[in-house]
Regions:
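Glycine-rich, acidic/polar active-site loops that bind/position phosphate-bearing ligands
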Residues: 1-175
Length: 175
């Protein structure tokens, strides 16, 4: 077992983490999650956790549905429940075929292979997520949402709720 995996197992035991969430994405980038008991984690590291890949959009065909999730210990994070009473662990996973090979349909694996190919060609790849959101007024009716102002994408707004909120976000990110 790798050192990072052993460290995760120790952290889970010492911090009384009672649930492990295994995260991966479908081909559209939509986050998916499988939850396991901490007692299954050592086997997940060594063998992977089986799941039906045909249930995930674009991952595999029905007759090739058996897939494996293998957690990447380097992505381990603690997640606190909303009320702060419980701590879960989460890790992103590699999606593998039943014989333990990387699935060609795994977006994370595809990115890793593309970065490796670019590196072999002498390029450096820099990637990051783009976080977007909408600022809406508290809805009276969930079917009729209203923005806090009429500013559009990239509009320069010097006053108002959206400008104040963006300023608070920037300050929080700088801390």
């Amino acid at each position: 077992m790798k050192q990072q995996q052993e460290q995760v197992l120790r952290s889970v035991a010492q911090e009384d983490i009672r649930l492990i969430r295994l995260w991966f994405t479908d081909v559209a980038g939509v986050l998916k999650s499988v939850s396991i008991d901490p007692g299954e984690l050592e086997e997940a590291f060594s063998e992977g956790i089986g799941f039906d890949g045909s249930s995930i959009e674009g991952l595999t065909r029905v007759y090739e549905s058996d897939m494996l999730l293998r957690p990447d210990a380097g992505t381990f994070q603690r997640l606190h429940t909303k009320d702060g009473t419980d701590v879960h662990g989460r890790m992103f996973c590699d999606v593998l075929t039943p014989d333990g090979l990387p699935s060609p349909a795994d977006p994370r694996g595809a990115l890793e292979r593309a970065v490796q190919r670019a590196s072999e060609m002498g390029f450096s790849v820099f990637a990051h997520p783009e976080i977007e959101f909408y600022l809406l007024r508290q809805p009276v009716d969930i079917n009729h949402l209203e923005p806090v102002d009429q500013a559009g994408y990239f509009d320069h707004v010097t006053r108002g709720l959206s400008n104040d909120f963006r300023r608070k976000i920037v300050r929080a990110l700088e801390e």
